[in-house]
């Protein structure tokens, strides 16, 4: 249904495209577009329903016995394939960002600087598909993002359709790599890999926005996931290098690096303790191990990012653009939510209350909270490998809640890790409900419904019902991805 609805109700081309080539343009207008939107919406509900049913089956089996982990993992994988395969052939949906990616790559190809110039400086077929809001906006992404776009547009020229296909392939690779590594991280910590894959990769937010929307988070999250896995397997330099590659794609990946330093420190300190004939490291081993791994991490990151920046032909202007663009305002970002509530109350008393002034102040305060929260997370989750990965997820949560701009696909970095570290059941419940809610909040064309009260209420009810269906037999005090002990089985 998502596949069928995408060609009339998705983020389709303004000019040309598959419908135009087939003489089916009427599907994108009038009543036919309404039908396409309905089909797409039904597809969203069916995708969510399949995910909920799968979750219910997993958690019922988890409560009943612990004998079918391999079968459960196979079931999740087969369901994931069934979700992804139809979307391979679907049009872009829930976002027009893929057209901006192509445009930015074409700018680098044609000698423009996307860090100082907007897409409008390079007219052509790709510019026509870029959302009007972003035609005069610089890119917040790293040099690898531009390099990939440069290579794709060099190969496909100005053929937008082929460019979209190329990004679809990259998105699928990114999600596949994420799934591969998440299963192994969960196994490393003794967590249930089936549930980790269910909540972290088969999640409707991941499917809809990573494959349907083709966001560069898909590749970034894949690189970070493999980097974390390598670090856990005592391949610190390789792990940091891969995460550094992800940083050069999108700076958000850098949040994981300080926690990888903790992982590397524990490994190196353990090695130093073993050389001294001790079972566990002392502070004397931990302190030099910390500085050694920290210095190595900084050096490797600097070399990798510098090499990619140089090889891509892009400038260092991406450093100044890391903060992103402040045009996007929605309640997913805490400062926007607070400013909206303040304005709603204030307008009762002041007719011309200035929302922009309020949101600017709240964003500044929220940014300080975010920076403080990241430091606190880094320090609190330093004790061992598992705590470091948990801290990575916590830090991503802090960053996305308190950042000035937040969009659903940003949460891919957090969602992917949720099932790997044996989280408490309440966290999985909350994540499942929030995932269903967020998955329902965007239309196929890419417009959010977060200010549509009726839609928000309906989505909230559906999300609540989903959690009831999935977890009706589970104890909220238990650990979500840990296999139950034999004595707990009735």
Swiss-Prot record:
Its main location: membrane. It is found in: Membrane. One of its GO terms (molecular function) is glycosyltransferase activity. GO terms for cellular component: membrane. Its EC number is 2.4.1.-. It comes from the Bacteria. Disulfide bonds: none annotated. Disruption phenotype: Cells lacking this gene show a complete loss of LM biosynthesis. Mutant results in the formation of a truncated LM with a reduction of alpha-(1->6) and alpha-(1->2) glycosidic linkages. It is a multi-pass membrane protein. Keywords: Glycosyltransferase, Membrane, Transferase, Transmembrane, Transmembrane helix. The keyword Lyase does not apply. The chain crosses the membrane at residues 34-54, 73-93, 163-183, 194-214, 226-246, 253-273, 290-310, 329-349, 361-381, 398-418, 424-444, 451-471. Belongs to the MptA/B family. Involved in the latter stages of the biosynthesis of the alpha-(1->6) mannan core of lipomannan (LM). Catalyzes the addition of alpha-(1->6)-mannose residue. This is Alpha-(1->6)-mannopyranosyltransferase A. It comes from Corynebacterium glutamicum (strain ATCC 13032 / DSM 20300 / JCM 1318 / BCRC 11384 / CCUG 27702 / LMG 3730 / NBRC 12168 / NCIMB 10025 / NRRL B-2784 / 534).
